[in-house]
Amino acid sequence: TIYFNPAAMTQLSGVQVSAGVNALMASAHQTNRGSYRSVPGSTARVPVTGNDGGQPFESVIPVPNFYASAQVTDRLWLGLGVNAPFGLKLEYDDGFFGRYDSIYTDLKTYNIQPSAAFKLNDNFSIGGGVDVQYVKANLTNALPQVSPLVTTDGFTKLKGDDWTVGWNAGLFYTNGTTNVGVHYRSGINHKLKGTQTISGLVTPLSAANGEFDASAPLDLPDIVTVSFMHKLTPNLRAMITGKWYGWSSFKGIEVTSATGTTNKELDYKDSYSVSLGGEYDFSPAFTLRAGTMFDRSPTNPQHLTTRVPDGDRVWLTGGATWNISPAFALNVAYAHTWVEKANIIRPDSYFPSPATVTATTLAQTSGNADQVAASLTARF
């Protein structure tokens, strides 16, 4: 509630504290469709060979969360949320055919959200909060040598972090039978600062090896959420939620360092998701829920990358709440996600002319994901 619409905190009586974890189990597979590299001063195309990179995701990726709300008066609520709204971690095996595109990616965000909600009357509430967000990134990929006869690759590593502040606000309406929520979360424009390390390049590029101060912007999207819930019977509720993501603010990975500015164009598009679901109270102690969602990928088909092996997604979810006692509730959920196959055509150019080498990654990506979530809520 606090993260998705703090205005709905007015539906939480007393003091409530919830702590939980999402366990993400993702898989992806890359198939080489004829990747190649150029040779400076020639029109030749040299095949880039290698293995398929193996399973790039860890077997289980835990993502914790924490929320607390307190009813201060009959009209005022205060809350705090801590979560990780965006993240990605994957690593391909040594010798991956797409190594000039990506090898290792570790992006983490941590969001701390103090919030407040105010009940205007029995039907309407407003709420909002501040998003204090930390991001940390670590990205690596191989670098092609000028001569294709050199059997070893160069290597580049970029790491950086940043703290930035955003905001969010929402409106909540209820008449006891129908709930409607509208929420807006601002985009957050990070400016990561850290280092870029280049190693392994041989003559005539060996002078480029070294560690340099570097910076890179990271623009995370603004999000608009509209949700609707209606009681069909005293025990059965239907829900629909639509979200819009302003991902078009994310243009690519632009790194500025002493060696110059490089840009890996991604050109994300605005995206959306639509979910339908229902929940049924079998008893005052036990509630069962299920739903489905279509989630449009923001990735641009013209600029796909093995660093983000993504496509449109279809979700199928189920979950339950067990009210163990008036003071404690256990929430569990499971989701399976089907990810659409996509073809990657990724040309990336390295080094100034006349030593420019363009490595073109041609791949087909496919994958899916499972998530298991559990949380414990305490009421005081």
Regions found by a protein language model. Give the residues of each.
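N-terminal periplasmic accessory domains that precede
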Residues: 2-7
